[in-house]
């Protein structure tokens, strides 16, 4: 906008908002500055708005900052409004800036667009804005006058100085002139104000003028209440009031419409009040009591008094004149009774005839109907003073009806403090006279006294009222004729009773009153008989009880209506007493206990007394605030409330079986009559009972009541008939208040019953029935309708009235909907409520748009805040686009949101809620957040896109909020700062790259963002603002996300400097200390802090910060070992402090969080941490503390502590004696395992379906990970406990400690039982693997192995292990998955379980030998098919899994081969099959090692690569498509796979050959006499190298080929370091060392030679072999071995390593190192052996 920058003056509405405390300006100094700056405007009042002038027109036209179109529109507006041209332009600018409903971009075009310009005036939007500005200005003055003397108001001192200034500068004179001007102003016409001034506009102008007149008079009245008025001022006012007829003879009265009557009446009322207040009656009464009337101002103003007489003498034809005439007449009489003229006497009599007390009652009722504020209280005080003056100076009989006086007093005493003022006065003066009068007529006239006392009850006077009525000293009754049992005085002025009299004709035993014999009574005769006042003392409360009893007696007679009229004031009084002072409730029990019977009986009469019943229900509602349970129980027996005929079901869909009770019949009558007093009382009662937090059983009884409200009232109340204005709004408010109270009940404990509680009933009904639509309709009223109602309400304060009631109802609807969405159970189906909330309407007519437009509401900031809160909730949970719902209004609404966010006086809570809404929108509303981000895109020369912030981008505001140097930043408002940082965190968390890129480039962004991290935080207390902790937490998370997203080299220099500064200024240490202190505070308070949310946020962020720092130590400069030790020490100490606190879920949760980061630090910083002994000691204490808690709550925590212990044990190898409290730690771990394993087994048995067995698959070719059950997790307690037990077991080298534990606890039987169950049903994979790892470690010691064997390990696993690998029922097996895609070989799998079991058998056999031989043979016998299948599968499935199983299997067979005789005895056929399969296995391994191309072929097939169907030449590769061209990464992966497979084949080959040695004769024995039958011929007599794909019997050629392969590999490793195998095996990162590989190759070679020689000698000594074959064997073998010997000699001459098994060879050992150096090949035992054999063969 062109001149937006010129706006510097605050609008009157803004000023009013500031004074109300609804802005961000809360400090008294700020309020004082505003009042100083705009005090002159307040003093001028409406005169601030000047009329048009020629000079002003010239200034506007000369202003170069204004566009011509804006000047023109401003001048037209000036003529239309009759306002100064400059002010008109300024008004137009502020309207376009604050209230225009379009985008700020479109504002520029409004003045140029004729259609839009006309719309501003024709649609009255500009007019409304101007009128509101005028009213707001007067409201500011009113507000200041109301509260400048109120010490409780926070700005009373500032207001007082402002009032002092205005009083000095003659506020009254200025405002009186304004009032005169308004009274005499001519109505505008189209000639004077332009063509836009239509009749409707004139009518609106007149309404505005009436409202302004009323407010000016109200200001003058309040001014006179504080400052004395001079007689001349009163005279001038009186003349003016007479001129305009106290509002009845207005200048433009032809414009008055019926709707304006309340304003006209209000003008008259304030005119009268000003007159009464200006008379200063209180001073007059004080002067009269002291006989110093000459001190009154009017006593010396005789001329003014005469003029006043002449002015007032003509009055008397209107009700407004009554109080004026009477007050003036009494003043004249009090000042000088002797000089009272007949004119004055005539005024008095005229006033009495005008029914002044009825008028005063109507006046106070009218003032209080719209609002109940300071003005009303001041008016009541003024009338109270007037009544006191009248009653003091006039006889009561002169004042006509006593009832009118009582009615007026009832209204007067409704003001606070006036009842106390009355009780502190003399009882014989003023209204005390009235009290004495009504007491004299009690109980003949029952109502006046009760009504008066009902008004006199206050918090401080309730007990006085009770005591007064409890000690009544007279009883007045009426007699038509003189009774026969009376003795009378001669003049019949005194009577005396000769007999006692029972006052109430009640039954025997009932409460009653009895006038005793001899009682004296004063007689007052009247035209209807005798009125006798007996001198009889009694309690009125007893009398009231008798009256209620009498009503119960006459319920079914014609007297019931009359008796109800007598009893209703009693009930009203009791209600007021109980609601004011609950401590008196017990004393009133005889009365309140009878109300239930009244309800029960009167509900069923023909024409129930509705008002009376309403009072009864109200009384019970007041009583329920103190004793809700008792009221509910007693009320339930009456049948008044709705009830369920049948027990309440779990899901209430309809009201079937519900009875509306007595209230239901009354409800029908009320609907037909259009009056709803009982319904309102019913709602108040039920709300009170709900808030009373009844027990669950009693709350169930309220379900029918709530259901009645939800099904019958809420959906239909807006369609009912109403006789009175405003009742519908009250009903809606009460219904929603009840629902709101239910939804805000504290959650009850879970119960086993299926009956619904009140909350679930409300949630179900609102989400699935018409009740929810009714709430939506209330929210859908819209901001325009609400603003219109606010503008038309008659009250002057703007804070009370009909508009306020509607606003509160809408706010309740917002809160209810928000709570329903928050509390409703999760469901995949969309409920009708959610559908209605999110459905798209035509032309933007949908609820989302309506909610968003509440941002335009300016009166109460809590309304738009609640609307935005609901929008936020919907954006979180509803599957819809808010942006789409807003339609074409989206940009305008965005600008409105950002305008309020930018406004420096805007309420802080709205700003916070807007930011929270945007924070949610980042994740859930992509379209909307892009609209708010408003990023502008530019294409750079490089072809990339460059982003910048648009003018209306929310990031502009956020950057300003976090800028510590900006005076308007949020640094003074911690909650707002936190919300801004939270929004930025959402951008990083959702990875909004464009926004992040723009923010990174902003200067000082990282400095401003991270500033809080470098400050010094005060230690938090209960009263401190803790949002700074959340702010710091979000900042830490943003830094973590930035480091995580960005490549190290791409971090901005600014952030790098910040991180370096963070390290250099020792902020790691500072924050570690701070977080540690918070943790210790929580631990000391046992989790009872009020700030746990903030603490948890900071702790979570610090945890993330440390995790990122451990992985990016160089980036975050966390490399100092001392700092690392300090951080870990604090984390460990905090964890220990929290987890040692008993019975605190909070401490447990926080401790578990810290435990996670402790595990990471342990693993990442092993080398920097202190001795593990101290860490283990603390962890042991933590574990003991955790084990003392409820085990169902600490499962995850136990797992984390176990993981920490495992990591601590891995810091360095330790012996059991070095581990602190080792025995106790082992015992704790085993006891925990015992409990957890039992639970796991029970859980497994319950959860496993019956058909699990049919789903098992063959695991030979698959890595079946199984289905991980909920309790069988990799990081579960059982699994980690077993791994910890394994680590502890490794530390106990001797096994003594574990032996003791195994004797003390049944650990092994329990583990074996769990393992057996898990294996049988093939569940708990991780658990099974962990057990086997633990058992494998335990079996290293002889004691552990013996214990396992004794506990029956073989019986446990032998048969159940079959289910791990058996085929499914269809017998099919699945293909091996791609090697590069499947998990690591170490990942948990069922084949892995089988492999571990085989290894365990091997370890046990190795440790126990003959003691375990029988079990080992049993195991082999059971699994022989699997063993043989595994040995043969290497040829067809050369995958790592298959090779690994073959490796374990051959290893086990190697150990078992030490017992060949026993094996042959028990399993003769199996041993033969094993021998054959081992030979074939040897041949398969040799072939695969020999043909690397074939091995790669297999690997490529496993990886899914396409191969040619025909065999390709050895030197060629199959052409690949361009998409499959090999890359460096794929080649490296292929080499690693090749290395792994070759290494596995070599290990298998070595173990296979070593095992076969047990089945061939020993070289030392074979030359001696030997039984050859016990050794089978293993290899065929053939020397041909076998082909891989041919099923050829293993032969000598196989062994020779093996030697050739090993020799070739050794040569390649030495010659070609760049050979693929050499490269792979020689990598520094490889797990296989080059030296070990060479040793393994030599070991294979030795065993080949050994087998070759042994089998050759076996052939030579076998008589069954033909001599010709023996000779051929000698020749072939001699030739082959000679060739191999020469190759071996060359290898050893090059420096090859000696045989690893040289000591086992029969050839002599080398004698010294020097000999070996001279002729190394001659000294090699292997060569010597082969040479000896060659010589033997050649002989």
UniProtKB/Swiss-Prot annotation:
The keyword Protein transport applies. It holds the Pfam family Nup188_N-subdom_III. GO terms for biological process: mRNA transport; protein transport. Residues 1249-1269, 1506-1530, 1696-1717 are annotated as: Disordered. It is found in: Nucleus, Nuclear pore complex. Keywords: mRNA transport, Nuclear pore complex, Nucleus, Protein transport, Translocation, Transport. SUPFAM superfamilies: ARM repeat. Residues 1506-1528 have a biased composition (Polar residues). One of its GO terms (molecular function) is structural constituent of nuclear pore. Component of the nuclear pore complex (NPC), a complex required for the trafficking across the nuclear envelope. Required for proper protein transport into the nucleus. Part of the nuclear pore complex (NPC). This is Nucleoporin NUP188. The gene is nup188.
């Amino acid at each position: 906008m062109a001149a937006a920058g010129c706006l510097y003056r605050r609008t009157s509405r803004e000023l009013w908002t500031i004074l109300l405390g609804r802005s961000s300006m809360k400090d008294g100094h700020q309020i004082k500055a505003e009042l100083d700056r705009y005090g002159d405007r307040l003093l001028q009042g409406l005169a601030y708005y000047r009329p048009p002038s020629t000079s002003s027109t010239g200034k506007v036209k000369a202003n170069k900052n204004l566009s011509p179109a804006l000047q023109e529109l401003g001048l037209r507006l000036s003529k239309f409004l009759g306002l100064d041209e400059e002010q008109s332009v300024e008004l137009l600018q502020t309207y376009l800036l604050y209230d225009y409903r379009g985008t700020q971009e479109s504002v520029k075009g409004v003045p140029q667009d004729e259609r839009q310009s006309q719309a501003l005036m024709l649609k009255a939007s500009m007019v409304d804005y101007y009128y509101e500005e005028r009213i707001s200005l007067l409201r500011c003055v009113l507000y200041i006058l109301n509260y400048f003397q109120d010490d409780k108001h926070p700005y009373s001192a500032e207001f007082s100085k402002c009032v002092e200034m205005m009083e000095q500068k003659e506020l009254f004179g200025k405002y009186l002139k304004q009032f005169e001007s308004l009274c005499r102003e001519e109505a505008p016409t189209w000639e004077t104000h332009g063509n836009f001034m239509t009749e409707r506009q004139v009518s609106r102008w007149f309404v505005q003028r009436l409202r302004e007149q009323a407010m000016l008079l109200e200001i003058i009245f309040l001014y006179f209440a504080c400052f004395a008025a001079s007689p001349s001022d009163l005279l001038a006012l009186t003349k003016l009031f007479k001129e305009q007829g106290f509002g009845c003879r207005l200048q433009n009265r032809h414009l008055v419409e019926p709707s304006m009557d309340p304003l006209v009446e209000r003008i008259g009322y304030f005119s009268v009040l000003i007159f009464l207040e200006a008379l200063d009656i209180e001073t007059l009464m004080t002067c009269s009591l002291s006989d110093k009337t000459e001190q009154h101002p009017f006593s010396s103003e005789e001329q003014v008094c005469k003029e006043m007489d002449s002015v007032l003498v003509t009055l008397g034809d209107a009700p407004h004149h009554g109080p004026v005439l009477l007050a003036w007449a009494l003043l004249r009489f009090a000042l000088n009774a002797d000089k009272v003229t007949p004119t004055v006497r005539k005024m008095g009599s005229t006033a009495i005839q005008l029914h002044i007390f009825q008028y005063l009652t109507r006046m106070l009722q009218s003032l209080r109907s719209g609002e109940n504020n300071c003005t009303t209280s001041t008016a009541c005080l003024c009338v109270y003073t007037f009544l006191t003056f009248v009653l003091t100076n006039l006889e009561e009989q002169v004042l006509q009806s006593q009832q009118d006086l009582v009615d007026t007093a009832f209204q007067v005493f409704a003001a606070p403090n006036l009842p106390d003022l009355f009780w502190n006065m003399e009882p014989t003066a003023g209204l005390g006279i009235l009290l004495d009068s009504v007491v004299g007529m009690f109980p003949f006239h029952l109502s006046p006294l009760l009504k008066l006392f009902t008004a006199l009850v206050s918090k401080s006077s309730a007990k006085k009222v009770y005591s007064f009525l409890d000690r009544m000293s007279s009883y007045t009754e009426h007699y038509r004729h003189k009774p026969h049992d009376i003795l009378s005085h001669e003049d019949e002025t005194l009577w005396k009773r000769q007999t006692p009299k029972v006052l109430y004709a009640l039954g025997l035993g009932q409460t009653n009153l009895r006038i005793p014999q001899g009682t004296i009574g004063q007689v007052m005769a009247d035209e209807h008989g005798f009125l006798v006042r007996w001198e009889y003392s009694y309690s009125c409360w007893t009398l009231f009880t008798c009256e209620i009893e009498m009503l119960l007696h006459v319920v079914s007679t014609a007297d019931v209506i009359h008796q109800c009229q007598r009893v209703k004031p009693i009930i009203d009084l009791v209600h007021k007493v109980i609601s004011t002072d609950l401590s008196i409730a017990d004393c009133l029990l005889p009365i309140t206990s009878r109300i239930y019977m009244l309800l029960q009986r009167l509900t069923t009469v023909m024409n129930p007394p509705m008002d009376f019943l309403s009072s009864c229900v109200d009384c019970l509602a007041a009583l329920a605030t103190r004793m809700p349970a008792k009221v509910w129980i007693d009320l339930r027996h009456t049948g008044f409330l709705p009830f369920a005929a049948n027990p309440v079901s779990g899901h209430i869909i309809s009201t079937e079986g519900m009875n509306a009770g007595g209230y239901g019949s009354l409800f029908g009558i009320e609907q037909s009559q259009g009056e709803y007093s009982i319904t309102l009382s019913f709602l108040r009662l039920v709300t009170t009972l709900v808030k009373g937090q009844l027990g669950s059983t009693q709350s169930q009884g309220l379900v029918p009541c709530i259901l009645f409200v939800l099904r019958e009232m809420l959906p239909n109340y807006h369609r009912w008939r109403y006789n009175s204005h405003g009742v519908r709004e009250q009903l809606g408010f009460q219904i929603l208040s009840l629902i709101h109270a239910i939804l805000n009940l504290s959650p009850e404990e879970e119960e086993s019953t299926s009956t619904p509680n009140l909350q679930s009933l409300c949630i179900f009904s609102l989400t699935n029935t018409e009740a929810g639509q009714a709430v939506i309709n209330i929210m859908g009223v819209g901001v325009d309708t609400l603003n219109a109602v606010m503008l038309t309400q008659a009250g002057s304060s703007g804070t009370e009235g009909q508009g306020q009631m509607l606003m509160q109802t809408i706010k309740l609807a917002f809160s209810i909907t928000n709570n329903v969405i928050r509390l409703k159970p999760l469901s995949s189906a969309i409920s009708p409520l959610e559908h209605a909330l999110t459905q798209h309407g035509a032309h933007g007519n949908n609820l989302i748009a309506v909610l968003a437009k509440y941002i335009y509401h300016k009166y109460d900031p809590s309304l738009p805040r609640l609307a935005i809160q609901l929008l936020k909730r919907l954006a979180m949970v509803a599957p819809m686009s808010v942006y789409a719902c807003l339609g074409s209004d989206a940009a305008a609404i965005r600008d409105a949101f950002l305008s309020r966010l930018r406004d420096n006086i805007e309420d802080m809570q709205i700003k916070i809620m807007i930011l929270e809404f945007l924070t949610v929108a980042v994740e859930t509303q992509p379209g909307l957040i892009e609209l708010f981000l408003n990023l502008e895109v530019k294409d750079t020369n490089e072809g990339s896109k460059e982003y910048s912030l648009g003018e209306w981008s929310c990031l502009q505001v956020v950057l300003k909020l976090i800028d510590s140097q900006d005076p308007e930043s949020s640094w003074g408002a911690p909650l707002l700062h936190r919300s801004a940082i939270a929004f930025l965190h959402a951008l990083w968390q959702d990875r909004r790259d464009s926004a992040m890129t723009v923010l990174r480039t902003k200067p000082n962004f990282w400095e401003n963002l991270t500033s809080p991290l470098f400050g010094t935080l005060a230690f938090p207390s209960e009263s401190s603002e803790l949002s700074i902790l959340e702010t710091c937490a979000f900042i830490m998370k943003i830094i973590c996300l930035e480091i995580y997203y960005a490549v190290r080299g791409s971090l901005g220099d600014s952030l790098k400097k910040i991180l370096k500064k963070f390290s250099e200024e020792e902020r790691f240490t500072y924050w570690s200390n701070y977080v540690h202190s918070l943790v210790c505070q929580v631990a000391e308070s046992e989790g009872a802090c009020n700030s746990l949310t903030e603490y948890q946020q900071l702790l979570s962020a610090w945890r993330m910060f440390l995790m990122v720092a451990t992985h990016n130590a160089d980036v975050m400069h966390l490399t100092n070992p001392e700092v690392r030790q300090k951080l870990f020490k604090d984390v460990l100490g905090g964890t220990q402090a929290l987890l040692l606190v008993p019975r605190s879920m909070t401490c447990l949760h926080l401790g578990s969080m810290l435990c996670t980061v402790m595990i990471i630090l342990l693993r990442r910083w092993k080398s920097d941490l202190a001795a593990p002994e101290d860490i283990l000691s603390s962890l042991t204490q933590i574990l003991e503390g955790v084990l003392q808690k409820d085990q169902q709550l600490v499962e995850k925590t136990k797992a984390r502590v176990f993981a920490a212990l495992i990591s601590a044990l891995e810091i360095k190898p330790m012996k059991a004696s070095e581990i602190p409290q080792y025995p106790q730690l082992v015992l704790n771990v085993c006891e925990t395992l015992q409990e957890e394993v039992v639970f796991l087994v029970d859980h497994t048995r319950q959860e496993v379906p019956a058909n699990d067995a049919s789903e098992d698959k063959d695991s030979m070719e698959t890595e079946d990970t199984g289905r991980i059950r909920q309790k069988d997790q990799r990081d579960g307690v059982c699994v980690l406990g077993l791994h910890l037990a394994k680590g502890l077991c490794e530390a106990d080298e001797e096994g003594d400690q574990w032996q003791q534990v195994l004797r003390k606890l049944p650990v092994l039987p329990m583990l074996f039982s769990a393992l057996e169950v898990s294996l049988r049903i093939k569940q708990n994979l991780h658990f099974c693997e962990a057990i086997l790892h633990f058992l494998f470690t335990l079996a290293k010691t002889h004691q552990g192995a013996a214990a396992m064997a004794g506990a029956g390990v073989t019986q446990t696993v032998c048969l159940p292990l079959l289910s791990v690998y058996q085929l499914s029922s269809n017998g099919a097996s699945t293909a091996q998955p791609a090697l590069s895609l499947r998990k690591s070989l170490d990942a948990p799998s069922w084949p892995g379980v089988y492999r571990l079991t085989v290894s365990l058998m091997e370890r046990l056999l190795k440790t126990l030998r003959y003691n375990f031989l029988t079990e080992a043979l049993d195991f082999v016998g059971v699994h022989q098919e699997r063993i043989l299948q595994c040995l043969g599968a290497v040829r067809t499935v050369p995958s790592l899994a298959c090779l690994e199983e073959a490796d374990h299997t051959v290893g086990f067979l190697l150990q078992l081969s030490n017992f060949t005789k026993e094996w042959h005895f028990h399993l003769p056929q199996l041993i033969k099959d094993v021998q054959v399969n081992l030979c074939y296995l040897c041949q398969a391994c040799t072939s695969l090692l020999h043909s690397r191309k074939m091995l790669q072929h297999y690997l490529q097939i496993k990886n899914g690569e396409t191969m040619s169907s025909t065999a390709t030449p050895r030197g060629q590769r199959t052409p690949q498509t361009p998409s499959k061209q090999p890359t460096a990464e794929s080649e490296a992966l292929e080499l690693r796979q090749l290395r792994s497979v070759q290494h596995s084949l070599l290990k298998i080959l070595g173990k296979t050959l070593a095992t076969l040695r047990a089945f061939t004769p020993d070289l030392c024995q074979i030359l001696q006499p030997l039984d050859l039958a016990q050794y089978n011929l293993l290899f065929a007599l053939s020397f041909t190298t076998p082909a891989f794909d041919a099923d050829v019997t293993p032969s000598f050629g196989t062994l020779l080929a093996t030697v050739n392969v090993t020799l070739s590999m050794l040569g390649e490793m030495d010659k070609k370091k760049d050979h693929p195998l050499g490269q792979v095996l020689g990598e520094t990162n490889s797990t296989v060392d080059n030296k070990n590989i060479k040793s393994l190759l030599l070991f294979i070679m030795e065993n080949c030679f050994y087998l070759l020689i042994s089998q050759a000698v076996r052939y030579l000594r076998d008589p069954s072999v033909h001599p010709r074959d023996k000779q051929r064997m000698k020749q072939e073998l001699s030739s082959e071995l000679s060739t191999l010997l020469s190759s071996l000699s060359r290898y050893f001459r090059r420096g090859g390593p000696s045989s690893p098994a040289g000591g086992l060879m029969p050839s002599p050992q080398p004698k010294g190192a020097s000999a070996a150096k001279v002729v190394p090949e001659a000294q090699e035992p292997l060569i010597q052996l082969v040479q000896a054999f060659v010589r033997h063969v050649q002989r």
